[in-house]
């Protein structure tokens, strides 16, 4: 029985799921917006938000924890040098999920997951307002 078990299986075994979310978290931190299915986006929140919270207090121990979870030194650098200071005053809620229709092959519901307050989005809004 699956009573009180949190998280989605997504038809993958645990090592595949862990590797997939590690790669997706790295892509989201690197590009600040990615397109994926709604279910994967909702699960990805549970991986990325604790990483950003960890990056808000910069220490060697926290950097090692972040590296252990992402296995990508470039991503760890961006987390602690850009994203941690950017979200220093925000108490959680670092991501936004925007639904964007259905995928053309299997009609899976798709969504963009993005980091809130990313600079490119702010510039686009200002240009549209002018």
Curated annotation (Swiss-Prot):
One Gene Ontology biological process: translation
UniProt entry keywords in alphabetical sequence: Ribonucleoprotein, Ribosomal protein
Domain of life: Bacteria
Gene Ontology CC terms, in alphabetical order: cytosolic large ribosomal subunit
Covalent S-S links between cysteines: none
TM regions (residue ranges): none
A Pfam family per the record: Ribosomal_L17
GO molecular function, one term: structural constituent of ribosome
InterPro entries: Ribosomal_bL17, Ribosomal_bL17_CS, Ribosomal_bL17_sf
Quaternary organization: Part of the 50S ribosomal subunit. Contacts protein L32.
Family per similarity comment: Belongs to the bacterial ribosomal protein bL17 family.
Protein's recorded name: Large ribosomal subunit protein bL17
Organism of derivation: Shewanella loihica (strain ATCC BAA-1088 / PV-4)
């Amino acid at each position: 029985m699956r009573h009180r078990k949190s998280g989605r299986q997504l038809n993958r075994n645990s090592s595949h799921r862990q590797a997939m979310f590690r790669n997706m978290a790295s892509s989201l931190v690197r590009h600040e917006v990615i397109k994926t299915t709604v279910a994967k986006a909702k699960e990805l929140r549970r991986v990325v938000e604790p990483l950003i919270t960890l990056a808000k207090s910069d220490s060697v121990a926290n950097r090692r924890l972040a590296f252990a979870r992402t296995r990508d030194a470039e991503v760890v650098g961006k987390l602690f040098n850009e994203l941690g200071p950017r979200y220093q005053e925000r108490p959680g809620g670092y991501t936004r999920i925007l639904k964007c229709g259905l995928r053309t092959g299997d009609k899976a519901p798709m969504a963009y997951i993005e980091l809130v307050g990313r600079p490119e989005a702010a510039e686009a809004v200002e240009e549209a307002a002018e």
